[in-house]
């Protein structure tokens, strides 16, 4: 019982870091390895797959994931109406913004008025890896 109290007291005293394992109060130079992660990964799984080359790191050395928003992975949707509004969408397979005529109703979020808006939102298409599901190591 006394041991359990000491262990729970140590757990309270441990300082946590976002990216590194915490260190204990008795031996500050030795890391304490938690049973489960301290925090979930700041980048969701889809971000880790779709992130482009050249991620940056914050002051603690944690990667800051700059990911393509979800709307960029949506398929082209012209809609059921018969108007012909010039629009752009991000072609996920080709990794670039492409022109299409939108019907005028029921769009999805992968529908941009200008190529600039498309590139700004889904951007870095020209600088992306040729295959998004292969993780390169440098």
Curated annotation (Swiss-Prot):
Task: Please list which residues make up the signal peptide.
Answer: 1-19
Tissue expression profile of the protein: Prismatic layer of shell (at protein level). Expressed primarily in the mantle with highest level in the mantle edge and lower level in the mantle pallium.
Coiled-coil segments on the chain, per record: none
Task: Pinpoint the BPTI/Kunitz inhibitor domain residues.
Answer: 72-122
User: Got a GO cellular component term for this one?
Assistant: extracellular space
Tell me the keywords, alphabetical order. Answer: Disulfide bond, Protease inhibitor, Secreted, Serine protease inhibitor, Signal
Q: Output the superkingdom of the source species.
A: Eukaryota
Which cysteines are disulphide-bonded? 72-122, 81-105, 97-118
Which GO molecular function, any one, fits this protein according to its record?
A: serine-type endopeptidase inhibitor activity
**Name of a matching Pfam family:** Kunitz_BPTI
Where in or outside the cell is it found?
Secreted
Keyword S-adenosyl-L-methionine set for record: no
Q: Which PROSITE patterns match?
A: BPTI_KUNITZ_1, BPTI_KUNITZ_2
Its protein name is: BPTI/Kunitz domain-containing protein 1
> What's the source species' lineage?
Eukaryota, Metazoa, Spiralia, Lophotrochozoa, Mollusca
